[in-house]
């Protein structure tokens, strides 16, 4: 196996990429990745555009196995030992939360192997951010502390047989991240696309077809891959998720999403209340404010025992109680709603599905609803948690 670099001593290089932003980069003394001949990176293939080929009518369909993907990447075997697990070969629109739970369980078992350095999951880009987020919340703090290894999700915006296919480059960069030997400041779950590394908790797909489709609004990437160099921002680990509740056997909770619109009178909120869902995510305007005529329906939902979380329709920025007008975040807090911080509605839905499917969480919810909501608020926005609940009190 050929080494990419011969250095063995690590040094820390600090530089300013932009004013008042401190970036710490971990590199070897010759600036190259340390090749780990005795370590293995597992390619966990789920499907997606990265695995698609054109059918007889010219439409893209999932067709390539994980082994086929690896064969198209020159130099991949030179980085480390590669193993492949073919979990599925589907478009990511067909990936369900139940599949995400199974992926999480299998990946955690793989990471327990002492010879495994990390896992790279090849996945469709449409729901890649959701699977990444689910993995980040399903890794307990205890597991992350014991098995300090990265999970890297990647995909492509172009089919496997397209001119200029980006899949091979994304896969190569992701394996470099997974076998990078300096992991103290690396979030356990990241997305690596177009040589940028994003935290699962912040990343979003922001373009339907551009190869630079993934961004982290308000935050930016936590690192990047440059040839054989892998850089990480100082403090990137702070964007990790992880909870103390055990992983549920099944996702039994029912959670809905409602997007607030002008003139909304809460009809969809009333519908979900009638369906006795366990949780409801409401996308508000801007800071999270809702139409005043929607508030009676929100109150009814909360009074019926539904956990309501308010998010924003905007792609960047956080929920904040800046206004005192009817339908404001202040009103929602007083009713008992939880604020979603900077998380998207799709990610908050997965968080509620995960937490509300756990027997211990349901027990806490029954015994002390206020404490449970405080815990939920802490998960979603620890910075605002104490202040938001003091307002309600």
Question: What is the meaning of each model-derived region?
Answer:
Residues 3-35, 284-393:
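C-terminal non-catalytic interaction/assembly regions of soluble proteins
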Residues 113-128, 275-287:
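Short acidic, glycine-rich surface-loop motifs adjacent to enzyme active sites
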Residues 53-57, 132-133, 163-166, 198-205, ...:
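Short acidic, glycine/serine/threonine-rich loops at helix termini
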Residues 52-53, 127-132, 164-171, 289-291:
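Short glycine/serine/threonine-rich phosphate/pyrophosphate-binding segments
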Residues 121-148, 290-299:
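Short Gly/Thr/Asp-enriched flexible loops that form oxyanion-binding sites at enzyme active sites
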Residues 153-227:
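Internal gly/pro-rich beta-alpha loop/helix module
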Residues 17, 21-31, 35-48, 54, ...:
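Accessory alpha-helical/coil subdomains and C-terminal extensions
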Residues 2-110, 316, 361:
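ATP/NTP phosphate-donor binding region
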